[in-house]
Design a protein with these regions (language model features):
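Short, conserved charged micro-motifs
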Residues: 42-45, 107, 221-225, 272-280, ...
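A generic structural motif
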Residues: 95, 259-269, 361-369
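N-terminal flexible segment immediately upstream of the FAD-binding catalytic core
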Residues: 1-48, 52-55, 64-95, 247-252, ...
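C-terminal substrate-binding/cap subdomain adjacent to the FAD-binding core in PCMH-type
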Residues: 136, 155-316
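Conserved glycine-rich FAD pyrophosphate-binding loop
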Residues: 69-76, 81-82, 126, 285-447
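Short, ordered loop/turn segments at secondary-structure junctions
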Residues: 62-64, 124, 245, 404
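N-terminal glycine-rich flavin-associated loop
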Residues: 5, 25-58, 75, 81-125, ...
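Residue-level detector of anion-binding/catalytic polar loops
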Residues: 55-56, 118, 236, 292, ...
Length: 447
C-alpha cells in the first residue's frame, strides 16, 4: 500500500510514523496512513483508491481543529492538504485571488499586505489555520461584523468529489453568472461532501488607518444599550467584541490597566477624517452609557491587540477535558443571554465561564475551562453543558460545542438535536458520497 502511494505522490509524501499518525487522530481514531498530495490529479487518484479498497477518508490541513465536530465511526486514511500551498493566481486590480487550500492565513496576509490588500478573516487560532480548513469549518472572527463570513468572501472553488470527479463551483468574478452557487454547499461541510482543492476569494484594500476604543463597565446592562446606539447611528464599525472579566484574566496577556467586570472593544477602519469623527462620537456614547474606563489604541497597538485575540487557541492538548461552546442568538436576545450565562456561572461553584462575544454579529463563545475536576463527574459535566444549551434554546438561540472530551462527542451533545432541514442534508450527503468514502459521524446528526 505504501509503495503504491509513494509511486503516486513521492517518497516523502506518505507517512505511517506513529508520531504523525497520532497528530492526525480525531476523537481517539488514528489513521493507518497520512497522504500529502500536491495536485488535484493526485487527490482524484486517492479517491479512486479509497473507493476500490473500501477505505474511509478524513480531510485535513494542519489538523488544528481536530477537536471540532462529533466523534467519527471509523478512519483509515487521512489526506493532509498542507503541501498544496501555492498561490495560483492573483488579480490585484480586480481584488481577487485564487489559492490552494494548504496556504495558511498568515502566509496569505503577508503576501497580500505587500500590495496593500488583505483578506478580512480572523478566526480563533488564525496563526495555525489553513484557508482550506477555515472554509471547510466556516470559522470567522470579529471582522465578520463588517466583511461577512466565508460565505460572503468565497467567490468560487474547485472540488474533488468522492467519485474522483473535479468540479468548479462559483466563479472568478464578484458578480457571478446566474445559476446555483454550489460553493456555498461545501463551505462549513467539514469535508463530508468533497475535497476543496482550490479557493477563489474576494479581497479588500488594506485600511489606511485603524483605531480601537476599549471601554469597561461594572454593570453589563449598559453594554447592550451602547451597542444598540452605535448600531442605530451612521458610524461604521469593523469589529465589536465583548469580553467578560474571567476571559481577560485567563486568556489575555495584558488588560492595559482597564479594570472592570465587563469589557467592550470597538474597532474602526478608514481615512483620518472619518476616523476622527467616528472615534469622537463613540467615545461620547460610551461615556453617556456610564463607561468606567476608556482607552484608545492607535493603529500599531490596535493591530497588536486584535492579532492577540485572533491568535488565541485557549485550549491546548493538556486541557482537552474542557469545553468550548459557540452560541448564535437573535439580535434582541444578546443582553438577556449574556446575563443568563453570567448568572448560571455565578450560581454554580463548580465551574467558571469565560465569555467572548462578537457582539455586533450576536455570536457568543463560552469557555468552560475551570471545571472542579474532583467534584465534577463526566455525567454531571454533561448535565451542566445541557443546562447551558437549554438557557440558549429558551431564548431562541442555538449552541454547538467546538471542543469537548471524547466521552462527550456524540452528535446530539456536540450539535444538539438536528433541525427540520436535516432530511435535506442527509439526502445531499447520500447523493454526493454514495459509497460513504468520507468518515461518518463528525457532522450534524452523525453525517
Amino acid at each position: 500500500m505504501i509503495d503504491r502511494f509513494e509511486k503516486l505522490l513521492g517518497k516523502k509524501k506518505v507517512s505511517n510514523s506513529p508520531e504523525e499518525l497520532k497528530k492526525y487522530s480525531v476523537a481517539g481514531k488514528i489513521p493507518s496512513l497520512i497522504l500529502f498530495p500536491t495536485s488535484i490529479d493526485q487527490i482524484s487518484e486517492i479517491m479512486k483508491s479509497a473507493k476500490r479498497d473500501g477505505k474511509k477518508l478524513l480531510i485535513a490541513g494542519n489538523n488544528s481543529q481536530h477537536s471540532f465536530g462529533s466523534a467519527i465511526e471509523t478512519l483509515d486514511w487521512c489526506i493532509s492538504l498542507n503541501r498544496m500551498n501555492k498561490i495560483v493566481e492573483h488579480e490585484a486590480a480586480d481584488l481577487i485571488i485564487n489559492i490552494e487550500p494548504g496556504v495558511t492565513l498568515p502566509q496569505l496576509q503577508k503576501f497580500l499586505n505587500k500590495g496593500q490588500q488583505f483578506l478580512p478573516l480572523d478566526p480563533m487560532g488564525a496563526q495555525n489555520r489553513t484557508l482550506g480548513g477555515i472554509v471547510a469549518t466556516n470559522h470567522s472572527g470579529p471582522l465578520r461584523l463588517l466583511y461577512g463570513t466565508c460565505r460572503d468572501l468565497v467567490l468560487g472553488m474547485k472540488v474533488v468529489l468522492p467519485d474522483a470527479t473535479v468540479i468548479r463551483a462559483g466563479g472568478k468574478t464578484v458578480k457571478n453568472v446566474a445559476g446555483y452557487d454550489l460553493s456555498k454547499l461545501f463551505i462549513g461541510s467539514l469535508g463530508t461532501l468533497g475535497v476543496i482543492a482550490e479557493i477563489t476569494f474576494k479581497l479588500f484594500p488594506l485600511p489606511a488607518r485603524s483605531e480601537t476604543l476599549w471601554a469597561t463597565y461594572n454593570q453589563f446592562d449598559e453594554i447592550p444599550d451602547l451597542i444598540q446606539s452605535i448600531g442605530a447611528s451612521n458610524l461604521v464599525v469593523s469589529r465589536c467584541e465583548y469580553l467578560n472579566r474571567i476571559f481577560i484574566e485567563k486568556y489575555m496577556d495584558n488588560d492595559y490597566g482597564l479594570k472592570g467586570m465587563h469589557h467592550i472593544l470597538f474597532d474602526v477602519q478608514g481615512n483620518a477624517e472619518m476616523m476622527k469623527t467616528t472615534v469622537e462620537k463613540m467615545h461620547q456614547l460610551a461615556l453617556e452609557k456610564g463607561a468606567q474606563n476608556i482607552q484608545l489604541f492607535s493603529k500599531k497597538d490596535s493591530t497588536k491587540l486584535w492579532n492577540q485575540i485572533s491568535s488565541l487557541t485557549l485550549f491546548d492538548k493538556k486541557s482537552e477535558s474542557d469545553h468550548h461552546c459557540q452560541i448564535s442568538i437573535p439580535k434582541a436576545s444578546f443582553g438577556s443571554v449574556i446575563n443568563s450565562i453570567e448568572n448560571f456561572s455565578n450560581n454554580n461553584m463548580l465551574l467558571s465561564l469565560a465569555i467572548q462575544a462578537h457582539a455586533g454579529s450576536r455570536i457568543i463563545d463560552v469557555f468552560c475551562g475551570d471545571w472542579n475536576k474532583e467534584q465534577m463527574s463526566p455525567d454531571r459535566c454533561r448535565s451542566q453543558i445541557e443546562s447551558l444549551r437549554q438557557i440558549v434554546k429558551n431564548q431562541n438561540g442555538n449552541m454547538v460545542i467546538w471542543q469537548a472530551p471524547d466521552s462527550s462527542r456524540e452528535p446530539a451533545m456536540i450539535w444538539g438535536e438536528p433541525g427540520y432541514d436535516f432530511h435535506l442534508m442527509k439526502k445531499i450527503k447520500t447523493s454526493y458520497d454514495q459509497h460513504q468514502i468520507f468518515v461518518a459521524g463528525r457532522f450534524i446528526g452523525g453525517l
